[in-house]
């Protein structure tokens, strides 16, 4: 199976591959950032956004991978084989997790469209020969819009009418469904 974890978010593994591996912060830094910014939403039993869900999954996968790495470290006798496994996990799996964490944290912080625009512009920049491109790579805005996570469900009723509503307007009434149309 060819599963791309970024597909439903409008990106792709290929699009993220334009960013060099040293671009992504360490897993520890990314986990600290996710915890500092989104702990309440990540620990909430309620669904927030697909990015929150994907971030939760990436964090859980990293935890499972660390459990496996600890088991290998404790049970693999051959130091050379142990080093090979640890290096493989850090190099390959670590990079994939860092990319996933960075992508979803960035989408929550800056907005998905901004992150996608950044990835495309960086991809164009990096593929342009040095003689024809600006000296500095594009940067993801350091002044993000405020991210608001709204819970699903009904909003609390207002006790007073909105100041924008004229008194002469009557509030809209909901149409009642006929019993035949209900399931």
Swiss-Prot record:
Subunit annotation: Homodimerizes, then multimerizes. Interacts with cytosol exposed regions of viral L glycoprotein present in the reticulum-to-Golgi compartment. Interacts with human FLNB. Phosphorylated form interacts with host importin alpha; this interaction depends on the exposure of the NLS, which itself depends upon genome maturation and/or phosphorylation of the capsid protein. Interacts with host NUP153.
Function, as annotated: Self assembles to form an icosahedral capsid. Most capsids appear to be large particles with an icosahedral symmetry of T=4 and consist of 240 copies of capsid protein, though a fraction forms smaller T=3 particles consisting of 180 capsid proteins. Entering capsids are transported along microtubules to the nucleus. Phosphorylation of the capsid is thought to induce exposure of nuclear localization signal in the C-terminal portion of the capsid protein that allows binding to the nuclear pore complex via the importin (karyopherin-) alpha and beta.
Motif (Bipartite nuclear localization signal): 158-175
Gene3D superfamilies named in the record: Viral capsid, core domain supefamily, Hepatitis B virus
Single annotated GO MF: DNA binding
Compartments reported by the entry: Virion; Host cytoplasm
Superkingdom classification of source: Viruses
Biological processes annotated in GO: microtubule-dependent intracellular transport of viral material towards nucleus; symbiont entry into host cell; viral penetration into host nucleus
Gene Ontology terms: cellular component: host cell; host cell cytoplasm; T=4 icosahedral viral capsid
UniProt protein name: Capsid protein
Residue ranges of the region described as 3 X 8 AA repeats of S-P-R-R-R-[PR]-S-Q: 155-177
Residues with the Phosphoserine modification: 155, 162, 170
Chain intervals for the UniProt region annotation (RNA binding): 177-183
Phylogenetic lineage: Viruses, Riboviria, Pararnavirae, Artverviricota, Revtraviricetes
PTM summary: Phosphorylated by host SRPK1, SRPK2, and maybe protein kinase C or GAPDH. Phosphorylation is critical for pregenomic RNA packaging. Protein kinase C phosphorylation is stimulated by HBx protein and may play a role in transport of the viral genome to the nucleus at the late step during the viral replication cycle.
Ranges of Basic residues composition bias in the record: 149-176
Primary subcellular site in the record, as a coarse category: virion
Chain residue ranges for the region called Disordered: 136-183
Start and stop residues of the Sequence repeats: 155-161, 162-169, 170-177
Record has rRNA processing as a keyword: no
């Amino acid at each position: 199976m060819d599963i791309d974890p970024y597909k439903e978010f409008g990106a792709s593994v290929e699009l993220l591959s334009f960013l060099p591996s040293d671009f992504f912060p360490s897993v520890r830094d990314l986990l600290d950032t996710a915890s500092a910014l989104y702990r309440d939403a990540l620990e909430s039993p309620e669904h927030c956004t697909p990015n929150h869900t994907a971030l939760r999954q990436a964090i859980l996968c990293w935890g499972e991978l660390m459990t496996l790495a600890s088991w290998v470290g404790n049970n693999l006798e051959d130091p050379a084989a142990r080093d090979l496994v640890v290096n493989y996990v850090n190099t390959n799996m670590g990079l994939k997790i860092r990319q996933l964490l960075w992508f979803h944290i960035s989408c929550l912080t800056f907005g998905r469209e901004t992150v996608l625009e950044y990835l495309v512009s960086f991809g164009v920049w990096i593929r342009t020969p040095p003689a024809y491109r600006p000296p500095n790579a594009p940067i993801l805005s350091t002044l993000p819009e405020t991210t608001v996570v709204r819970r699903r469900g009904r909003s609390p009723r207002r006790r007073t009418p909105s100041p924008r509503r004229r008194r002469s307007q009557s509030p809209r009434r909901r149409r009642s469904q006929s019993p035949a149309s209900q399931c």
